[in-house]
Amino acid sequence: MMNMRKTHPLMKIINNSFIDLPTPSNISSWWNFGSLLGLCLITQIITGLFLAMHYTSDTLTAFSSITHICRDVNYGWLIRYTHANGASMFFMCLFLHIGRGLYYGSYLFYETWNIGIILLIITMATAFMGYVLPWGQMSFWGATVITNLLSAIPYIGTDLVQWIWGSFSVDKATLTRFFAFHFIFPFIIVAMVMIHLLFLHEAGSNNPTGITSESDKISFHPYYTLKDMLGMMFMFLILMSLVLFYPDLLGDPDNYTPANPLSTPPHIKPEWYFLFAYAILRSIPNKLGGVLALFMSILILFLLPYLHTSKHRSMVFRPVSQCIFWLLVSDLLILTWIGSQPVENPFITIGQLASIYYFLSILILIPLAGLIENYMFKW
């Protein structure tokens, strides 16, 4: 009799995805972030579910319900801070996962890459709506500023904003619908993740060399399950250190003040993981131009497979591309820093230069480096 995991219709899918999956023998720890993202997603759904049991999506009681969760619910503070800091861990893993895809040329798996970018966009939308729910000052003003950007769209802009708000300002209707969407989106993300994995297993994993690994593969279990578990332990160590010792390190003090439409915070800014896009938005003086730049900063990732000019897939053997890649990483760190600073010189100028370099490196420098390296290798 054959092993049940190989014959049972449901077990067979799990077996082919996580146990007997043929995997390149040389994939490094940079390939751990996919499983870490899965763990983050499960953690967020579980903690979010428990928070939703005690949260009320009403402008009068939302802030109080968060206070109630932290003070009166058993381990409510732990669930709340795990959820808040879990989002930061999620985006940290997400950015490293995308960075790995860019460095090792994984974007040449077109379907997997495109589904991944759609996942990024949905995750960003989910995180933004979640930030509005505590109904603190930064929640309210962040929602007002970011949703108001859509009014820059010609003809339909103003109507679109009021349609999203469900009112003439960010109000009870806005909070209720944001809670509804924030609850349902993670389940859409789970479905998209399954499609992401389906396309990945269709093509097979990439590896650090970027060369085909058909002749040298090993089973996923036990080798990579153990490796993933080690990564998960490290991630939980960092997450729990944040939650238990520095729960408010990545938050904003303004969000401990209840939302007040009559008082604007001195400096409106989103969570740290949106700061790079926020800096690009602010670097253009024109409203519509800023909104287009904001959307393009994410949508530009769709172009990467078509901008690949090198004969080598991975950047491992490409020193010029490596330099440009690490300059791009530095540039994103600078943009993140600029997004948290007030709108005044020299921050305005630095933000504009960093924004120009961001688009320049992806659209021109990386493809150009590929052509130069082809010539250097005499291909």
Curated annotation (Swiss-Prot):
Membrane association type: Multi-pass membrane protein
One annotated GO biological process: mitochondrial electron transport, ubiquinol to cytochrome c
Keywords for this protein: Electron transport, Heme, Iron, Membrane, Metal-binding, Mitochondrion, Mitochondrion inner membrane, Respiratory chain, Transmembrane, Transmembrane helix, Transport, Ubiquinone
Subcellular location: Mitochondrion inner membrane
Gene Ontology terms for molecular function: metal ion binding; ubiquinol-cytochrome-c reductase activity
Note accompanying the cofactor annotation: Binds 2 heme b groups non-covalently.
SUPFAM superfamilies: a domain/subunit of cytochrome bc1 complex (Ubiquinol-cytochrome c reductase), Transmembrane di-heme cytochromes
GO cellular component: mitochondrial inner membrane; respiratory chain complex III
Binding site for heme b b562: 83, 182
Residues annotated for a ubiquinone binding in this entry: 201
Protein's job: Component of the ubiquinol-cytochrome c reductase complex (complex III or cytochrome b-c1 complex) that is part of the mitochondrial respiratory chain. The b-c1 complex mediates electron transfer from ubiquinol to cytochrome c. Contributes to the generation of a proton gradient across the mitochondrial membrane that is then used for ATP synthesis.
Subunit architecture: The cytochrome bc1 complex contains 11 subunits: 3 respiratory subunits (MT-CYB, CYC1 and UQCRFS1), 2 core proteins (UQCRC1 and UQCRC2) and 6 low-molecular weight proteins (UQCRH/QCR6, UQCRB/QCR7, UQCRQ/QCR8, UQCR10/QCR9, UQCR11/QCR10 and a cleavage product of UQCRFS1). This cytochrome bc1 complex then forms a dimer.
UniProt name for this protein: Cytochrome b
Name of encoding gene: MT-CYB
